[in-house]
A protein has these predicted regions:
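Histidine-/acidic-rich catalytic cores in large beta-rich domains
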Residues: 26-432
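Glycine-centered signal
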Residues: 1-2, 18, 315
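Bacterial N-terminal signal peptides that target proteins for export
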Residues: 2-12
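Bacterial N-terminal signal peptides
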Residues: 11-22
Length: 432
């Protein structure tokens, strides 16, 4: 395994320094908005943000508690300095998975198993009902939508589930005939609402393959799907990685699969064993041609329910060579600082054109960008937790091309060891 210290930091001192600038979110007081920005070293873009809650990072526990279960109904496009460039008002929902189209339309996974498409001005121009697709949704090159459903598996398959006494972290239970297993179903839907392709995990995976640490009945919990891009493996003759085949992440069994789109067979599977192995990961993608690491698979390894509890509570970004399954690169915080990068659920990442990696630590609402050596060159702390925010190029839509290019203003954070909040009597109102 070639982790090389650059995965955490080429120089241990560099990452230790970078780790000092990270909000730990155990404190009551911390800034929000853009907290770090080095324009000369960051890859600058817009960021598309949707929230779980508008007050998740409010200092008052009472305010946070009163907002529990209330989801804001806006999705925002911000620049690197945190300025809001555009807003869509949408049907409020806790997860709000969304994708921006090159036309400027926004496709959004909303409540009541409804997928919405809004135009730039916020008008609903398309809906699809009946497939929830809460965890992920992809726009395919033909403009069809690839959706995920988690419905009970058919009864004839349910009977194949063996009774097993298991003792997950929250107490013993019987897995098998006593609980209904939710499956994983993929549907490709066209703009007329027709299902033109479908795939069902219970036809292809062993129903008795499970993790004892997962919730009752939640067999796979597929949380991300991604069509394979053009890639060097297929160019060299490896049919498993045909562009358009589907990369699927089965969170609860800690495995990533490739599904042959034509035959529907599983043609590849992978995981990793670094520090106890993959643990409830999200957002597995193959890095696109033209980007550093092209052809490798990159994922957000949350660090929840790890084997032997080896990195429980410590999140990694892991880049894998899909041929050898060797780890090519890892981002993590080290030592006692490791608690400072952790998202129990959700999360995303993206390899950027300059070799940096964009990361969204969704549970805390912290979005940041790291160089290959681990140095943080941009960081933004949202008003609350986020739902896998995405990188949007400056020229991605006609509407964005018509806007002036945003200012890219350096933000240098204070030294945490020297920064002090003065007593109220010694400062003007609003000053710190």
């Amino acid at each position: 395994m070639t982790i090389m210290k650059q995965t955490r930091s080429i120089s241990a001192g560099l990452l230790a320094l970078a780790a000092l600038t990270q909000p730990a979110f155990a404190q009551t007081v911390f800034p929000t908005g853009t907290t770090i920005y080095t324009p000369a070293e960051a890859h600058s873009s817009y960021i598309l943000i949707s929230d779980h809650t508008a007050v998740g990072n409010h200092p008052s526990a009472r305010v946070r508690a009163e907002a529990e279960g209330a989801s804001p109904g806006d999705i925002r496009l911000i620049d690197m300095n945190g300025n809001v460039v555009h807003t869509w008002e949408v049907a409020p929902f806790f997860n709000k998975r969304c994708r921006l189209l090159p036309s400027g339309n926004l496709v959004y996974v909303g409540p009541n198993k409804t997928i919405y498409e809004y135009d730039w001005d916020g008008n609903v121009v398309w809906t699809h009902e009946g497939i929830g697709s809460v965890n992920d949704m992809r726009i395919l090159p033909n403009n069809n939508r690839l959706l995920i459903a988690h419905e009970p598996i058919p009864e004839e398959y349910q009977r194949q589930v063996r009774d097993v006494e298991i003792a997950p972290w929250w107490g013993p239970r019987l897995r098998g005939s006593g609980e209904t297993q939710l499956g994983a179903d993929l549907y490709e839907v066209n703009l007329d609402g027709e299902v033109v392709w479908e795939w069902h995990a219970h036809n292809h995976l062993d129903l008795n393959l499970f993790s004892p640490a997962t919730p009752e009945g939640d067999w796979l919990h597929v949380n991300s799907v991604a069509p394979l891009p053009e890639n060097k493996w297929y160019d060299a003759g490896d049919e498993r990685f045909r562009p358009g085949n589907i990369l699927l992440n089965a969170r609860n069994i800690n495995t990533v699969y490739v599904i042959d789109k034509e035959t529907k067979r599983i043609v590849w599977e992978g995981t990793h064993n670094y520090k106890g192995g993959m643990a409830h990961a999200h957002e597995a993608e193959m890095i696109e041609k033209g980007l550093p690491g092209a052809g490798n698979i990159i994922l957000f390894d949350n660090g929840l329910f790890t084997r032997h509890r080896a990195h429980t509570g410590q999140t990694f970004i892991v880049e894998l060579d899909p041929i050898t399954l060797e780890i090519v690169w890892v981002y993590e915080t080290e030592g006692y600082a490791n608690i400072k990068f952790f998202s129990k659920t959700m999360g995303t990442q993206k390899r950027l054109p300059n070799g940096n990696t964009y990361i969204a630590e969704d549970n805390t609402g912290r979005l940041f960008q790291v160089k290959p050596d681990g140095e943080i060159v941009w960081e933004y702390v949202n008003r609350g937790g986020t739902t896998r925010p995405s990188v949007i190029p400056y020229d991605f839509t006609p509407q964005l091309r018509a806007l002036p290019r945003p200012e890219e203003l350096t933000v240098t954070p204070p030294n945490n060891l020297e920064w002090r909040i003065a007593p109220d009597i010694h400062r003007e109102k609003g000053e710190y």
